[in-house]
């Protein structure tokens, strides 16, 4: 089974939890993304990995049209259900994968991808497609969890993420984002970076992590080297928590970012 099929199956199963999760529906980064976009009423927008539609809906009041795409039928069903509650008339959802977007070259003023890229088995193929569908003066805004540059910490974080969620591939480091963006002809600007608080019980329940895997995760966290525990700001009481890293990034075609 390839990465896309693993991701599709995982989110078909867990989609309702993502529809209501405060991290995705009410995260401060959602407002940061909208503000960074400076949207215009005539814009065409594409939301890649739209999930339950939170980013799609946040942008819709400010632009002409937003299309949300996702590979999970379960997620798209949640998005359509959420759309019916909002009465928006400029939003569409359809099935698509990030590496084969069914749209014309240079069609969109803005492409977004929020908390989805860590499910991609490689950044470059998806970024190449995003670049292809962007207008020459368009922009790409991404929000995602990121790995620190420290290899030990990065591997530990991704180990626990993969144990909790089989569809998790890798929390890409900023250096990897920069390299992949440059390889497809865009430049990257880091707009915001912050610590993302994680409540362990919510984290595992949202993905319906098996009891066996939950026990393994607890053991990994409890027996992690002290330096890792401190870096992740781990707590055990009154509830188990830790902190990841997240970033808001802007990519623009090199021709658009170059001085005249």
Which residue ranges define each predicted feature?
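A short acidic, Gly/Pro-enriched loop at the edge of an enzyme's catalytic core
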Residues: 99-110
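Conserved Class I S-adenosyl-L-methionine
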Residues: 52, 189-260
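Class I SAM-dependent methyltransferase SAM/SAH-binding core
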Residues: 46, 52-100
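A short glycine-rich, Lys/Arg-flanked "PGG" loop and its adjoining helix->strand segment in the class I
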Residues: 124-136
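Short alpha-helix
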Residues: 170-184
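Conserved class I S-adenosyl-L-methionine
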Residues: 1-43, 54-58, 75-78, 141-163, 202-204
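A short SAM/SAH-binding and catalytic strip from SAM-dependent methyltransferases
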Residues: 109-122
């Amino acid at each position: 089974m390839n990465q896309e099929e693993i991701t599709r199956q995982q989110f078909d199963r867990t989609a309702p939890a993502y529809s209501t999760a405060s991290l995705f529906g009410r995260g401060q980064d959602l407002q940061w993304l909208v503000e960074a976009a400076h949207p215009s009423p005539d814009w065409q927008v594409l939301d890649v990995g739209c999930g339950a539609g939170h980013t799609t809906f946040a942008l819709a009041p400010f632009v002409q049209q937003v299309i949300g795409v996702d590979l999970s039928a379960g997620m798209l069903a949640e998005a359509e259900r959420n759309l019916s509650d909002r009465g928006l008339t400029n939003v569409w959802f359809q099935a698509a994968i990030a590496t084969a977007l069914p749209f014309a070259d240079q069609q969109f003023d803005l492409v977004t991808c929020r908390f989805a890229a860590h499910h991609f088995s490689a950044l470059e193929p998806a970024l190449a497609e995003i670049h292809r569908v962007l207008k020459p003066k368009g922009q790409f805004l991404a929000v995602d969890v990121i790995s620190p540059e420290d290899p030990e910490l990065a591997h530990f974080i991704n180990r626990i993420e993969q144990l909790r969620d089989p569809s998790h591939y890798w929390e890409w480091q900023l250096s990897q984002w920069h390299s992949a963006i440059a390889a497809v002809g865009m430049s990257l600007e880091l707009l915001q970076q912050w610590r993302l608080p994680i409540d362990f019980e919510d984290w595992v329940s949202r993905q319906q992590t098996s009891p066996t895997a939950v026990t393994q995760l607890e053991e990994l966290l409890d027996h992690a080297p002290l330096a890792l525990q401190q870096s992740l700001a781990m707590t055990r009481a009154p509830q188990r928590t830790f902190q990841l890293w997240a970033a808001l990034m802007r990519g623009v075609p090199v021709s658009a970012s170059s001085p005249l």
